[in-house]
UniProtKB/Swiss-Prot annotation:
Region annotated Interaction with the F-box domain of F-box proteins, chain positions: 117-175
Source species of the chain: Oryza sativa subsp. japonica
Any one of the GO CC terms: nucleus
Database matches in CDD domains: BTB_POZ_SKP1 (cd18322)
Protein's UniProt name: SKP1-like protein 20
GO biological-process terms attached to the record: jasmonic acid mediated signaling pathway; protein ubiquitination; SCF-dependent proteasomal ubiquitin-dependent protein catabolic process
GO terms, molecular function: cullin family protein binding
InterPro entries recorded: SKP1, SKP1-like, SKP1-like_dim_sf, SKP1/BTB/POZ_sf, Skp1_comp_dimer, Skp1_comp_POZ
Length: 175
């Protein structure tokens, strides 16, 4: 009965535009920032998130909901009377499903990806921050500085002489 009441507890989150989102407490607690506010009894009238837009907050809620749901399914499989190999198989299926979800989740435009990184950092959601930062790292991996500038629309503000000096100073990185 206590577990049932816990899953039904709802938290109100307010985006920077003032849009209100009602989310399950378990989902909101994925954010360490929100978790601390709830624990400090600061969530009674809703939690304002001035650094997170409604568009990004809805994506963050989608991510957190899926991960909470997946953990719940994995826990249920582990708690059941199923033999150990079946529980291991169920956990593997949940992990595979989450990997697929995560891979699809980060297939967004750069602006959204960067906003997700900022939101994950602000809300202190380690899994989301790791996922989004790894996505950016993968976008950079194996590219030349010129390709990276083009990918991220970065203006080269080095003169050719300054660029050559940086290359000389960091020669070890180009070997």
């Amino acid at each position: 009965m206590a577990a049932e009441a816990e899953t039904k507890a709802m938290i109100t989150l307010r985006s920077c535009e003032g849009q209100v989102f009602e989310v399950a407490e378990a989902v909101a607690m994925e954010s360490q920032t929100i978790r601390h506010m709830i624990e400090d009894k600061c969530a009674d009238t809703g939690i304002p998130l001035p650094n997170v837009s409604a568009k990004i907050l809805s994506k963050v809620i989608e991510y957190c909901s899926k991960h909470v749901e997946a953990r719940g399914g994995a826990a249920a499989a582990a708690d059941g009377d199923a033999p150990a190999p079946a529980a291991v198989e169920a956990n593997k299926a949940v992990e595979d499903e989450l990997k697929t979800f995560d891979a699809e989740f980060v297939k967004v435009d750069q602006s959204t990806l960067f906003d997700l990184i900022l939101a994950a950092n602000y809300l202190n959601i380690k899994g989301l921050l790791d996922l989004t930062c790894q996505t950016v790292a993968d976008m950079i991996k194996g590219k030349t500085p010129e390709e990276i500038r083009k990918t991220f629309n970065i203006k080269n503000d080095f003169t050719p002489e300054e660029e050559e000096e940086v290359r000389r100073e960091n020669q070890w990185a180009f070997e």
